[in-house]
Amino acid sequence: MKGGASGGTLASMIEAVKAAKNDVRLRKEMGNPYILCPEKKDLSHRQVSVRGPVFDQDFQSWSGPFIMEAINARVVLRSHMLSGMPYGNNFLYREQMITGKGFKGRLSALTLSTMLGLFAVGVFMTPTRKILQRFLPKPGEGPSPEAQAAGYFDISLLGKTASGEKLDVQVTGDRDPGYGCTAKMLAQSGLSLAFDFDEADREGGFWTPATLMGDKLINRLIDHAGMTFDLK
């Protein structure tokens, strides 16, 4: 993966941390992986996130935390709920950054984990947060068009059943994941909503892309957004 962060994204993260620091209820909600599933009250199976360097046996590689898991996992869990719990009440989902094998991979995972941890602590504490804000990009600043065009992402999705069966999907994008590709995803999502559905196809509500648009959106992303989805 190759991409950058904008000042607006960082400012949003900082404001969320500031709000949670002063609100116990908000902190609990932000720490609840099922916060987007209020319609189903019996979801209590513990989700396990990668917090530090971990050697992943499936990929035979070291890995560290992925900063977007806190958002992505909650959307996936809501999709699962809206789909009728097809994977069962014990469904687990997590994301992590693969850093490679051997000593170099372990060191990269440790560095990644340490930097994210220090950033989180720095943002949480007022004095260090003010210092960080002097050096971080400001809202409106971010990756240049050239940097976005040079970016990319490569995601490995591995599904495992209770009986041990595995399903592997590779997803790639040809632009910066946070901006170049995200802009195309948003555009194709809007076009899908406008042209791929009759009004009677879906009721209103708090849907996710997977449960509302599904394969129709995937086809658009393949045809018009420079993305690939490869089932292995």
Can you say where each PLM-predicted feature lies in the sequence?
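C-terminal catalytic/substrate-binding lobe primarily of soluble NAD(P)-dependent oxidoreductases
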Residues: 1-232
